UniProtKB/Swiss-Prot annotation:
NCBIfam families: mutl. One of its GO terms (cellular component) is mismatch repair complex. InterPro entries: DNA_mismatch_repair_CS, DNA_mismatch_repair_MutL, DNA_mismatch_S5_2-like, HATPase_C_sf, MutL/Mlh/PMS, MutL/Mlh/Pms-like, MutL_C, MutL_C_dimsub. SUPFAM superfamilies: ATPase domain of HSP90 chaperone/DNA topoisomerase II/histidine kinase (SSF55874), DNA mismatch repair protein MutL (SSF118116), Ribosomal protein S5 domain 2-like (SSF54211). Belongs to the DNA mismatch repair MutL/HexB family. It comes from Herminiimonas arsenicoxydans. It comes from the Bacteria. GO terms for molecular function: ATP binding; ATP hydrolysis activity; ATP-dependent DNA damage sensor activity; mismatched DNA binding. GO terms for biological process: mismatch repair. Transmembrane segments: none annotated. The keyword DNA repair applies. This is DNA mismatch repair protein MutL.
């Protein structure tokens, strides 16, 4: 084809305006992207109060005002220029960037697809100055005096007015506003030291005053999360993790309450989400999603934030170490839970000293330390250790749970030391539930679910204490593999051996599985190997092995646990309570359902309308 053909054009340089509009396709995906970029600029400027005003879901207008450092008038034209920024000036600074923004392209991209006005005033300036974005190559920006307090206001009108094709892809006004409001919530959660206000079509939607993360998260995520959250605080070398995670019993049907931050930046990172999900994997019911607000802080040099145009993904220098740190931190936090109050959400346990250590607080409550125990069961816990066995139910009349009318034959007993938060058994209900009494009131226990969790944790610990048994295959399983699978196999032999696998590359397109973990010897070796290789490649380890192992142990525990309608003696019931107190995660069964609830004295008063 000749160069003179009308279908072929000569190579030519694009105009700055067109370049900015092309870049806007990635940076300014929808109105919420504009809100995000402008809020990040305000925070980088040191703002302590930020106002967000929207009209028609942000399409008609987005105006964001802050009280930050402001921009000097001579630098206003540079603020709207492409690839101009005050945040970095070298590759070294880029690799150690600590600010939310750094590319210097957001304002130029936004100005290319809207009517933008930037008004700013520094603290030492006599008045504010403003500049408008240019809409054609013939137009020039001019800086003019204006009114305004110290700080910056960016006013974005008629978004996509000059790119009508982009407007066609926008959703309804309420949908676009919902996305904008979610961006404000995300950033407000990351900076509780900054006050935020949000207005839509002249109506105030939200206002968040300066406070701590506990109050800010309660304000944004609601009382349900506030009542069912666990504190998270871990440090290991250069890594620091803090925030709140929701209890498994307060999980949600959608993953819309998951907020993870890396050095103050909200991210949707597969590695981090995988680590959190792995920690929850044997305490969540079905396809439920946990809620959390987690912040990870580390040296900026250890994380690359220049991975995605929206900066929502990051890359860690040592991804495996970060994954393991987050996984173990969340796992330890989930092991510290307390009772589920009757008719209320579960509450966290602040002390890490035992599986259920909240009774120290109850010991100091207004409840009397003495209560009547009808069966005289307040005896040493050592007497219960060997009683709870899975033999057949006894036909002896003494093995049946005593009826409540026998209570009067026993005198009052004293509540023992505070290592018995679940109290002591009173009776068994319909062969399913255990009724127990503690200083706070009445405890209701699902005995099968509780025993299932106890056995499950015991099986896991027993397996973890021994070396992983490997089962060599009599005939190796060979299968076709792509280049990534072969490369992962060759580069990660140590990890694969630690997981109990012997996988070798026979050719550039063939892998052979020679050994698998003995516990999974009946699984499909090819499918198992592919799943493990995928996890090792993406996360530096495999959740597949843990999931398969836990599925088998969970099934074994379920079939071994005491069944419904089995009559237990009072000592057997007390032995189960003691085992629950000594077992991590005893508050949920293997499927994420609660194993016990607390019915407090105040709850009983309400049921009988006492005190009215």
């Amino acid at each position: 084809m000749h160069a003179s053909s009308p279908s072929v054009r000569p190579i030519q340089a694009l105009s700055d305006q067109l370049i900015s509009q092309i870049a806007a396709g990635e940076v300014v995906e929808r109105p919420s992207a504009v809100v995000k970029e402008l809020l990040e600029n305000a925070l980088d400027a040191g703002a302590t109060h930020i106002s967000v005003r929207l009209e028609q879901g942000g399409v008609k207008r987005i105006a964001i005002t802050d009280n930050g450092r402001g921009i000097a008038p001579e630098q206003l034209p540079l603020a709207l220029a492409r690839h101009a920024t005050s945040k970095i000036n070298s590759l070294t600074e880029l690799e150690n960037v600590a600010t939310l923004g750094f590319r210097g392209e957001a304002l130029a991209s936004i100005a290319s697809v809207s009517q933008l006005t930037l008004t700013s005033r520094t603290a030492d300036a006599a008045h504010a100055w403003e500049i408008s974005g240019v809409q054609s190559i013939d137009q020039k920006s001019t800086v003019a005096p204006s009114s305004g307090t110290a700080g910056t206001t960016v006013d974005v009108l008629d978004l996509y007015f000059n790119t009508p094709a982009r407007r066609k892809f926008l959703k309804t006004e309420q949908t676009e506003f919902g996305h904008c409001a979610e961006v404000v919530r995300r950033i407000a959660l990351s900076r509780p030291d900054v006050a935020f206000s949000l207005t839509h079509n002249g109506k105030t939607i939200d206002h968040w005053a300066v406070n701590d993360i506990a109050r800010r998260s309660a304000h944004i995520l609601g009382n349900e999360f506030s009542a069912a959250r666990l504190p998270l605080k871990e440090t290991a070398g250069p890594l620091r993790l803090h925030g709140f995670i929701g209890l498994p019993t307060a999980s949600k049907a959608r993953g819309d309450a998951q907020y993870f931050y890396v050095n103050g930046r909200f991210v949707r990172d597969k590695l981090l989400m995988h680590a959190v999900r792995s920690a929850y994997q044997d305490v969540l019911h079905g396809d439920r999603y946990p809620s959390y607000v987690i912040s990870l802080e580390l040296d900026p040099a250890l994380v690359d934030v220049n991975v995605h145009p929206s900066k929502i993904e990051v890359r860690f220098r040592d991804s495996r170490a970060v994954h393991q740190f987050v996984f173990h931190a969340v796992t330890r936090a989930l092991a510290q839970t307390s009772a589920t109050a009757f008719g209320a959400a579960p509450s966290p346990t602040p002390a890490p000293s035992s599986a259920l250590p909240w009774l120290r607080e109850q010991q100091q409550s207004t409840f009397a330390p003495q209560f009547n125990s009808p069966y005289g069961v307040a005896q040493s816990a050592a007497n219960y250790g060997a009683l709870f066995a899975n033999g057949p139910a006894s036909n002896d009349s003494n093995s049946a749970a005593p009826s409540l009318h026998t209570a009067g034959s026993h005198g009052a007993t004293t509540l023992p030391d505070d290592e018995f938060p679940l109290g002591f058994a009173l009776a068994q209900l319909h062969g399913i539930f255990i009724l127990a009494q503690n200083t706070k009131g009445l405890v209701l226990v699902d005995m099968h679910a509780a025993h299932e969790r106890i056995l499950y944790e015991q099986l896991k610990h027993a397996l973890d204490d021994n070396e992983l048994q490997v089962q060599p295959l009599l005939i190796p399983i060979t299968f076709y593999a792509d280049g990534m699978e072969v490369g992962t196999t060759e580069d990660n032999q140590d990890i694969l051996h630690a997981l109990g696998f012997d996988i070798a590359a026979l050719s550039p397109t063939t892998l052979a599985v020679r050994a698998v973990p003995a516990l999974l010897k009946n699984a499909d070796a090819q499918t198992l190997a592919r799943d493990v290789l995928r996890d090792v490649r993406e996360f530096g380890g495999s959740r597949v092995l843990l999931e398969r192992r836990n599925e088998l142990l969970g099934t074994l525990a379920c079939h071994t646990a005491v069944r419904a309608n089995r009559t237990l003696t009072v000592p057997e019931m007390n032995a189960l309570l003691r085992q629950m107190e000594a077992t991590e995660r005893a508050d949920q069964c293997n499927h994420g359902r609660p194993t016990w609830v607390q019915l407090g004295l105040s709850d009983l008063d309400k049921l009988f309308e006492r005190g009215r």
